[in-house]
């Protein structure tokens, strides 16, 4: 009898998860519910900065269940994304080697902020994957600066693109950041709207890592779709 009850509980859990995933897929049919920004970016000026997280000297980021670090994984995503955006007629450039003092996060961010302005980036995305000491932590989320309305809209569309391509991955939503929070220096400091992409937990084997391992190009297509839809439907004149 005990085994039967355990099997029933597991079956109920699987059914609940399936219903949750179906609801997430249904939400994709709707446009993200975000306020319309007060300013827009002309299409001809759209220049996407694709920043590979942990590109500062002496840093490669967290390591996934498969032994691949953040920088190595996202370097591939960045190169694919640049090509995918080009197919959409959207200009972009990759930043995968931050300047600054060795080992200094602040110095690297100061260099990156100046570099993005010099390259006339109109939006900036920094690519990461999440990590946790709790191997069960999973799902995708996008971070934006709490006072940036365009940053919020960009985060929503990137999340929407990822949900379209990876519908079975938990949606943790968009998350605002304020001073002192993780990622705040990048999100606040850039002259343009910015977003930090955390599409999965590299420290979660199932479902996150098994879904995203060797799928760098699928992930880049998800990001490109989000950027394209954002530019078509929400911001660009």
Describe the residue ranges of each PLM region.
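Solvent-exposed loop/turn segments at secondary-structure junctions
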Residues: 54-57, 98-102, 129-134, 147-150, ...
